Design a protein with these regions (language model features):
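Conserved Rossmann-like nucleotide-binding pocket used by diverse enzymes
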Residues: 2, 25, 50-52
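Non-catalytic, surface beta->alpha helical segment in thiol-disulfide oxidoreductase systems
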Residues: 78-104
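Conserved helix-turn-beta segment immediately C-terminal to the redox Cys motif
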Residues: 18-19, 34-54, 58-60
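Short active-site neighborhood of thiol/selenol oxidoreductases, capturing the structured segment around
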Residues: 15-27
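Structural micro-motif
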Residues: 20, 60, 66-75
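Conserved redox-active cysteine motifs that mediate thiol-disulfide chemistry
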Residues: 24-38
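N-terminal leader/targeting and pre-domain segments
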Residues: 1-18, 101-104
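Short acidic active-site motifs
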Residues: 10, 58-62, 94
């Protein structure tokens, strides 16, 4: 399943149950463009995890809320609470490990 788009209006409702991997990104960010296909691949493979995207240029309030000061930033939110965060381009193997840690 493709990642969903989060805004300040739907963020809390979409992340309140289960594990959600939230990709804070921007259209002008080269590393973000390289991260996207990795996240898309994981989203297809891991059906028990929700994947979502937040455009930091359009959703500055969310970027501030999660203290995003570099992109890409990936936030791992379990049952509405931030449990892990990774900044920078991240490999598929590291993301898989972070997802498994965040599920526990």
């Amino acid at each position: 399943m493709k990642p969903i788009v989060l805004t300040k209006d739907n963020f809390d409702a979409e992340t309140k149950e289960g594990l959600t991997v939230v990709d804070f990104w921007a259209s002008w960010c080269g590393p973000c463009k390289m991260q996207a296909p990795i996240l898309d691949e994981l989203a297809e493979a891991l059906t028990d995890v929700k994947f979502a995207k937040v455009n930091v240029d359009e959703q500055q309030q969310l970027a501030i809320r999660f203290r995003v000061d570099a992109i890409p930033t990936l936030c791992f939110i379990r049952d509405g609470k931030l449990v892990n965060q990774v900044v920078g381009l991240t490999t598929k193997d590291r993301l898989t490990a972070m997802i498994n840690i965040s599920k526990a």
